[in-house]
Amino acid sequence: MIRGNQIVVPDYQRAYSWEKGRQVSVFLDDLEDYLKSSVAAPYYFGHFLYEKTGEATYAVIDGQQRLTTIVIFLCTLFNRIREYREFSDEEQDLYEDIIKRRSTYKFSTVKYDNQLFKDYVIDQTKKDRYGIDTTSGSRIADAYDYFSGKVKDMELSHVEQLLHATAKASCTTHIVNNEAEAIQMFIFQNDRGKKPSHLEVIKAQFMYQIHIYGGEETDSLIEEVKNRFEHIYRSISEVEDFVEEDAVLLHTLKVYFNSLWESTPTERVNEEISKPTRLQFIKDFSLALERSFNNLARLNSDRNNDVNIEAALACGRYEIVLPFFIKAYTKGIPLSEISRMGKALGDLMLRDRIVKTRADLRSRLNDVFQQMETSVDDVVGRIIWMKEVGDRWWAYWNNNVLQLAVEANWHHNDHGIAKIILWKYENHLISSEGKSGYAPISYRSILKPHLEHIAPRTENGEKEAAGYDTYDDDFRENYLLRLGNFLLLSAPHNESIGNKPFELKRSTYDQLRQQREIQIMTETDRVWNKAKISERQKKIVDFILNNL
């Protein structure tokens, strides 16, 4: 299909999404298994769907992940052969037929990744990853580096075998003749390597609806949707470390229809594009999606400098928290007010994780979410009120319920929340010092936060010399697993001290304020016992009730 033609990945297709630890490695493993099997029939790459766009040009509609991977793999094979020797005439013809003939590239990916594809994969003029600003671009580089690493240790004969198997492989194809038909086919086709996301399918649906109903506006609307999704794809790399693209679609739906109860994006979108107002909805919702991705990128950046925002994200519950942030940014609410809202939301989400209630927060917050336009006062006020209210329907998160929960034992599955509490407690100690120039610390600044049991769960073999209380039933059941016996440490710190005597561990407690607090508490009496745990437990519980 590539020989004598030019293949392009159209902009309405999803960008490269195969991952080196999954589909990319399976691609090579399958080829290697084929070579070992000695099967006479050519290797089969599956079915491909194309749209004919010119005399010898085609847009790949289904199978682009496989086709992109094939081209990347072939480039690494050609590069490896070139390191051994000059191309044979047959190899030179093959390279020019399916990779590049003079200045003509035979395959092009989506336009925002295509220059990278040329520079990093085909021409190898780019040797580093600086400036790669899309997730798909990073995956292209990952796939190329993975294949390059695999073939660099291969014998020339094996590289030649792989090249022959790939170049001579068979496939089946289907060709359509216009973009509308191609988009419709894409909606109903599934790439066998990775199923399209809901966002990708909705994008294709938008473009198909424009082709059918756009009339004189078709070209301008298609261009608008393509541009919006190009910006969206660039933003994905800035937010994928904490939210998936289909989740952003759902959050956008909640903001667009102003309800935390929205839950079925594809059904809701299908409902809207079946109405006579479909074109206006497509324009408005595409803009809303672009804004959501941009605003989440801002949020991801702002949380690096604002512990209130970071804390609101630390507990998860994104299905509630993120729509509030997206809407606040969209409405142009000042960052200082967004931070104030983040403090309130973070406190409530942490309470929710601590008390472990099944009561639904959406029903308690949806009305203030809907009312938020230029101020966060109603949101913050509602959360403050929920901390004190005694009414049964509202009281699941109040101080009485919270105190019962924090005074209980904290088992292993609670450690993630305990670490967040102690991080917030650390910042409370910093602010309590009243010294200027000391900013709160970011949770992400602590290298792999660990939860340290000051008195270890397993009794130290040195008995009295260990510096801990007697490990009787009361100590094990009522002290070992309390917050007062927990300390926040980095992973290297925690792993270095292990189950050592208290005096040795105490000497290392000099990094965080809460660590130095332990040193101060035991300055005259170097024993960590029930009384010390109870004293510290009270400090932490008082902090929680007064500050969360």
Model-derived regions: residue spans:
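Amphipathic alpha-helical interaction surfaces
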Residues: 76, 80-83, 191, 328-331, ...
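Betabetaalpha-Me/HNH-type nuclease active-site subdomain
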Residues: 28-56, 380-520
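Generic hydrophobic alpha-helical scaffold/packing signal
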Residues: 186, 326, 342, 346, ...
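Secondary-structure capping and boundary motifs in well-ordered enzyme cores
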Residues: 58-66, 161-166, 174-181, 310-318, ...
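A cross-family structural signal marking well-folded subdomains
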Residues: 199-202, 209-425
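Active-site-adjacent bridging/hinge elements
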Residues: 1-4, 39-54, 156-163, 288-303, ...
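Glycine- and hydrophobic-rich flexible loops that cap the catalytic core of alpha/beta enzyme folds
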Residues: 1-260, 499-501, 506-548
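Short helix-capping/linker segments at secondary-structure and domain boundaries
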Residues: 80-84, 193-195, 213, 330-338, ...
